[in-house]
């Protein structure tokens, strides 16, 4: 608390400090003389500027005791966290420490720090001034920093590399395609089935991706796109990646088997084998690897359809699978074109550099195939006929960029044959990002237009009424 009957002179020294803030403060006190104190102000106190002491600006509020009075009261120093007391004595400061001269005073103090000497009282005060936090608060701050650092190190060295092994963004896309198909099935659905389908599909996808990374660190290190993967960086070893893949694959398949049904479990296990085994091997053998990879992408919709007990012989299930299969080509062919030189350097046999014309032509061909596949979903009563209309907008958008990509590639091939220079195909990137938006958009529209979705609001269609009457 502040002591009464102590005459003080309210003085605030606002000193601009850099890393040597303590030295500047010491120099400030050593190069000054005593300031006389009057008795006109009683019970005055000043609170410190609410700013971290580590900042380049430090405000030092302090009160001066009356050294001329018979009774010398202890100096009171009040900060925003604690009250620091200094033993009686003469605390000195510059007689010219007025507001306009503060910056000049701090500069002069810093230059004369090595030539000055200070009394124990002055030194004690300044030490208190620059470290006026309580011990409890300092310990709490240090403990919080240590905990945050430990959490960050734990994340970087323990679970983050294993999450990266699963290729989270790709896994999310795989899970969403399975969930969308599950939502579109005409059979009854349940929350429990959906939960097991989601977890099991995610674990199976993560297992396949971990096997893929564990087998290719030497080649992934040659590509900018893949050199940051955990096995390449040494965050996990290939054996650890394979162990992780074995655990997640086993748990994922078991979740699908016991929580959904054996058909879905078989499809999940086959996807691990196709992606982690056949596709990864073919990447360095033949361009057919892209078609095998597309089959891998087509399996999750079949898993979602079968999860509700729907028959895999239903044409609607294969329209959904075909949708995912066809989408792979404009998406991946545009992606691989942009980094075709890196694929070639790493030894991956991709159509983008083996046969650029075929690469662009295949991308356009399968982009156009999206139109009849969406019509098929309506024809086989998976969606209503309005889906054909609005899905055609997204299909036309992606098909347009696929066409421009193919057209420009033909021009580039002609220029190369004539021995002329040509620039990078600018439509590859546009097609890639167009495909990223296209697939979620089409799946969302399909769920909105699911057959019978809006019968509660608009009533059943004429076809549904005829079916009801005939039955």
From Swiss-Prot:
A cellular component term, taken from the record's GO annotations: mitochondrion
Gene Ontology MF: a single term: protoheme IX farnesyltransferase activity
Catalysed reactions, as listed in the record: heme b + (2E,6E)-farnesyl diphosphate + H2O = Fe(II)-heme o + diphosphate
Keywords associated with the record: Heme biosynthesis, Membrane, Mitochondrion, Transferase, Transit peptide, Transmembrane, Transmembrane helix
Signal peptide stretch: none
Location (main, coarse): mitochondrion
Enzyme Commission code: 2.5.1.141
Transferase is among the record's keywords: yes
Segments passing through the bilayer: 188-208, 247-267, 287-307, 312-332, 368-388, 430-450
A Pfam cross-reference name: UbiA
InterPro entries: Protohaem_IX_farnesylTrfase, Protohaem_IX_farnesylTrfase_mt, UbiA_prenyltransferase, UbiA_prenylTrfase_CS, UbiA_sf
Biological process annotations from GO: heme A biosynthetic process
Top-rank taxon, per record: Eukaryota
Cellular compartments annotated: Mitochondrion membrane
Targeting signal (transit peptide) range: 1-60
EC supergroup of this enzyme: transferase
Topology in membrane: Multi-pass membrane protein
Protein role: Converts protoheme IX and farnesyl diphosphate to heme O.
Family statement drawn from the similarity comment of this UniProt entry: Belongs to the UbiA prenyltransferase family.
Protein name per Swiss-Prot or TrEMBL: Protoheme IX farnesyltransferase, mitochondrial
Species this protein is from: Yarrowia lipolytica (strain CLIB 122 / E 150)
Gene that this polypeptide is encoded by: COX10
């Amino acid at each position: 608390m502040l002591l009464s009957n102590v005459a003080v002179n309210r003085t605030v020294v606002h000193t601009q400090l850099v890393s040597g803030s303590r030295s500047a403060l010491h120099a400030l006190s050593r190069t000054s003389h005593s300031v006389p104190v009057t008795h006109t102000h009683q019970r005055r106190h000043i609170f410190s500027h609410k700013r971290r002491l580590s900042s380049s600006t430090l405000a030092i509020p302090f009160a001066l005791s009356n050294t001329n009075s018979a009774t010398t009261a202890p100096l009171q120093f009040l900060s925003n966290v604690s009250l620091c007391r200094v033993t009686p004595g003469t605390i000195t400061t510059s007689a010219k420490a007025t507001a306009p001269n503060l910056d000049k005073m701090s500069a002069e103090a810093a230059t004369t720090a090595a030539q000055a000497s200070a009394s124990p009282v002055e030194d004690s005060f300044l030490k208190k001034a620059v470290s006026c936090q309580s011990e409890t608060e300092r310990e709490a701050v240090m403990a919080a920093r240590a905990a945050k650092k430990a959490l960050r190190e734990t994340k970087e060295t323990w679970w983050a590399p294993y999450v990266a092994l699963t290729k989270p963004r790709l896994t999310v896309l795989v899970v969403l395609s399975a969930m969308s198909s599950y939502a579109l099935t005409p059979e009854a659905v349940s929350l429990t089935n959906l939960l097991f389908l989601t977890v099991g599909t995610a674990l199976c996808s993560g297992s396949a991706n971990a096997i893929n990374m564990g087998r290719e660190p030497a080649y992934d290190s040659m590509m900018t796109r893949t050199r940051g993967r955990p096995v390449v960086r040494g965050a996990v070893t290939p054996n650890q990646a394979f162990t992780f893949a074995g655990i997640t694959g086993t748990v994922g398949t078991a979740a699908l088997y016991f929580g959904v049904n054996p058909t879905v479990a078989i499809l999940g296990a086959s996807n691990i084998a196709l992606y982690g085994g056949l596709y990864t091997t073919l990447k360095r053998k033949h361009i057919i690897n892209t078609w095998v990879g597309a089959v891998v992408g087509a399996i999750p919709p079949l898993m979602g359809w079968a999860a509700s007990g729907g028959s895999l012989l239903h044409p609607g299930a294969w329209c959904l699978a075909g949708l995912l299969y066809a989408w792979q080509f404009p998406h991946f062919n545009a992606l691989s074109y942009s980094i075709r030189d890196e694929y070639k350097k790493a030894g991956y046999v991709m159509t983008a550099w083996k046969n650029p014309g075929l690469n662009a032509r295949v991308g356009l061909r399968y982009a156009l195939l999206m139109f009849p596949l969406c019509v098929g979903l309506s024809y086989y009563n998976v969606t209503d006929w309005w889906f054909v209309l609005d899905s055609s907008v997204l299909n036309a958008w992606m098909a347009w960029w696929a066409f421009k990509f193919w057209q420009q590639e033909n021009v580039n091939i002609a220029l190369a044959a004539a021995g002329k220079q040509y620039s990078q195909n600018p439509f590859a990137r546009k097609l890639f990002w167009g495909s990223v938006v296209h697939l979620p958009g089409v799946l969302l529209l399909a769920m909105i237009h699911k057959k019978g979705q809006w019968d509660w609001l608009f009533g059943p269609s004429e076809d549904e009424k005829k079916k009801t009457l005939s039955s």
